[in-house]
Amino acid sequence: MLADRLKPFLKRYDEISESLSDPKILSDISLVTKLSKEQRSIEPVRNATLQYLEVLKNIEDNKSLINDTELGDLAKEELKNLEISQNKLEEEIKILLIPKDPNDEKNIFLEIRAGTGGDEAALFAGDLLDAYLRYAELRGYKTEIVSQSEGSAGGFKEVILLVKGDGAYSRLKFEGGTHRVQRVPETESQGRVHTSAITVAIMPEIEDSEIQINENDLRIDVMRASGHGGQCVNTTDSAVRITHIPTGLVVTNQDGKSQHKNKEAAMKVLKARLYDLQEKERKAKEQSERKDQVGTGDRSGRIRTYNYPQNRITDHRINLTLYRLDAIMAGGLFDEIIDPLIAHAQAEAINKSEI
């Protein structure tokens, strides 16, 4: 019974409350921080559980009154409302019981790379970056372009955006994958629709304690920053390229004004990429024969199509099609896609865990 599964949450919440009133524990700042964080994580389940148990009690009380000559009709009507509340709370609680992704509250690195399609892919990479920036602004996230390589006709061959804010990873993790665009390029005189693609990677920002890098595994090269066509734009060796020798991962950064800043930024991106690589390897080992319908970073899979002539955006993972591509891109209204993706992922998680 669901109620029996919820009681340990109430017990643990009360235990923590008691501990946080103990002077001995209050003198240990790190322990207080740890317990407070645990209590905050339990609180939504605890509050929903208290409501749920109250509804169950009221249901039993009204059932006992059904055969009462004076209160029977009123009890039946109240019972209908209580059962609706019960079902609603059960759904809310099931979602709350889904194991949390440890990365959900982290900041992210959002990496966009132009793929097939040449200049048009680079231009769309720029358009998608602008849309993500608008989305971040709507959500109250702070953004910073960490690294960029501009396309010869505009847009970007590659751009890395740091997105800071509570829940940034939880909202944007579903954006990882191949994004296909179908539209008529400005340079197309015959009006033909061209298809191009870009890839998006979503990587959580990693704390130093979460991943260890052996300095001997790194090759660090410094050079002068370059602009369009490779021409030098700096008279000092401020650009930094870091190669992780065991994996072959390479990160280059030249956007900062100093070599130190560029190295620091490049190391952050490298750590995120290494963590991303490790997570992929771990998930590959754990993955059952039945793959998740909603991926959260598989760059090999086409996840979404942006069809400009039809004003259509389609997310292929959940077969969602919206005919308001212009509004979504112009306003950064990605929640219209992200919310259904999250709901689908939650339903999948509930089915798997048999909550």
UniProtKB/Swiss-Prot annotation:
Q: What is its main location?
A: cytoplasm
Q: Which GO terms describe its cellular component?
A: cytoplasm
Pfam families xref list: PCRF, RF-1
Region: Disordered, residue numbers: 280-307
Q: Which UniProt keywords apply?
A: Cytoplasm, Methylation, Protein biosynthesis
Recorded GO terms, molecular function?
translation release factor activity, codon specific
Reported modifications of this chain: Methylated by PrmC. Methylation increases the termination efficiency of RF1.
Keyword Protein biosynthesis belongs to the record: yes
Q: Where is the composition biased (Basic and acidic residues)?
A: 280-293
Q: Which SUPFAM superfamilies match?
A: Release factor (SSF75620)
Keyword Ribosomal protein on entry: no
Report the locations given in the UniProt record: Cytoplasm
| Residues carrying N5-methylglutamine | Q231
SMART domains assigned to the protein according to its UniProt record, in alphabetical order: PCRF
Query: Do you know which HAMAP family this protein is assigned to?
Result: Rel_fac_1
Q: What does this protein do?
A: Peptide chain release factor 1 directs the termination of translation in response to the peptide chain termination codons UAG and UAA.
Q: Which family does it belong to?
A: Belongs to the prokaryotic/mitochondrial release factor family.
Full protein name: Peptide chain release factor 1
Organism, per UniProt?
Campylobacter hominis (strain ATCC BAA-381 / DSM 21671 / CCUG 45161 / LMG 19568 / NCTC 13146 / CH001A)
Q: Which gene encodes it?
A: prfA
